Amino acid sequence: MHHQRGMTLVEWMVSITIGLVLLAGLTALIARQSSTQAELEKSSRQIENGRYAMQLLNEDIQLAGYYGEFSNVSALAVPGTLPDPCLTAVSDLESAMAFSVQGYDSPATGLSTCIAAANHVSGTDILVVRRVEPATLTIAAAAAAAGGQVYLQSGLTASGLEFSKKLGTGADASGTSVFTLFNKDGTTLASLRKFLVHIYFVSPCSVMSGAACSGSDDGGKPIPTLKMMALSASGGTTTMSTTPLVEGIENMQIDYGIDTTGDGAPDGQFVAT
């Protein structure tokens, strides 16, 4: 008859110790894998957000200076000083049309008239794009829409000898003193296009809880965000409104290719002043 001998206390302790070591190693491995996966997902989001931001900017910049049928941009008067993109008066908007692309190189305090220093990441560039929407609408439709919305009309003058442009608001469309240009038939008033001013900048937060970004925004963890301030209308008044575009954008630096010889190709890379 064979007797079975149980495990001693020492053997039990050794077994438990080995098990705990294996469990600790497995836990550490799972934790590292989870951390690695989280970092990969974070990197993927950053790459995708950056790609999306570039796509948005690319699409808008391609249309910079598009003013409908009015293609003689070189005939536009160039103001003596750099225009303020925050101004919304029709006269200011019209005088700035020659600057279809306007940039600010790493300003420290944003744009004093519409982008407060607290809402702009210091040292990041600001880009301004001016153009019109490709889609047209009739003067009657513009008159029935928001009164403060700015529109551009391009067409023939009453004499039929000159092609020109007119800039005005939806309120102007209810009369006949501003939008007076014609189609090529000389009798039908030319259609209108929304006039656009887009100001792109990097903000230290995504959703503001107050009038300016603060440490309490975005759940107490402010997310740097690419935002766009756009010419719009509210309550019959022309104004600027801000829209968050892409979260996770911490910096924006822009170089400008300038064609100095008129051959259609950039001859050098420059930064804005």
Mark where each language-model region is:
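N-terminal pilin/flagellin-like segments and related low-complexity appendage regions
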Residues: A53-T273
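Aliphatic-rich helix starts adjacent to a transmembrane/signal segment
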Residues: H3-N58, Q62-A64
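Intrinsically disordered, low-complexity regions enriched for glutamine and histidine
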Residues: M1-H2, Y151
